[in-house]
Each structure stands twice: as structure tokens, then as C-alpha cells.
Amino acid sequence: MTTTINADTSVGGAIVTGDTSGQLGLQADGTTLLTVAGDAVTFNKGISETIYNLSGTALDPANGTIQTKTLSAGVTLSDSLSSGESLVLMLNGGVTYSVIFPPMTWVTSSGNAAPTLTANDTIVFWKINTTLYGAYVGSYT
């Protein structure tokens, strides 16, 4: 279904702007929040991401692109990312409990090797086509 929005349409205090070149904008209180031109989206204000406390084992960005997990036992994580998706995982307790990662390619200076976890770790996951990638960002206190 295609919906046509006319330029300078106001909905709930937000204004949608457009021009003949196909550029689309979203304004609130007279400030442009984002602009869509061709295949580029420009954000003029901050982006707020959902933070999710991962209680299960599925790495799924639909729950939030920043996730936290505190381990109370060993865990086997599973891949629920689609191509083009990514997420950040802040993991607590990896030095105490075993963590088994899904099949993936680790991006490291020493080659395709999973990190040695500490008490508190940050890892970024992303998927291109069918390949899951991971990069160890580092530990935190």
C-alpha cells in the first residue's frame, strides 16, 4: 500500500515538507529533524536507541540495538540478526561463566579469534549477507 503525503502536511505538531526533487523533511517546532533525499537520510538531532536487558540467548536487534546481559550461568548465544543489522552487547560475568558465541567471523588484529572475556566486556555484532561478524571493543568497569 502506498500513501501519498502532501508537502507541508501537519500531523500532531509535526510537519512533513517536500519539494519537486523528491526531498522529504520532518519538522517539529520549526526545526528540521530529518531529511530524506534520494537514498540518504540526514538526522539533524540525536538518535535515541533502545537499550534492552537480554534475558534469553538470542542476539536480536529487534529488541534493541544496545543490549546488556549479566551472566549467572554459562550461556550459548544465538544469531537472530538479518543482513544489514547490528547491535552492541555489554556483557557482565564473562570471566566467571562460559560464553559460547554463534558461528561467526571475529574481526581482530590477531585474526579470526574469539576474545578472552573479562568481568565486563563490550562486543559489537553485525551481519552482511549470511555472515555474522563480531568485534571486541574492550572491557569496562
Residue ranges and their predicted role:
Residues 77, 111-115:
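Beta-strand-rich interaction surfaces with strong enrichment in secreted/lumenal proteins
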Residues 2-44, 139-140:
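Beta-strand-rich receptor-binding modules of extracellular spikes/adhesins
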Residues 42-105, 119-120, 124-141:
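Exposed extracellular interaction/assembly regions and N-terminal maturation sites
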Residues 17-19, 82, 116-118:
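Short coil/turn motifs at beta-sheet boundaries
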Residues 105-111:
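A conserved acidic, glycine/proline-rich C-terminal tail/linker
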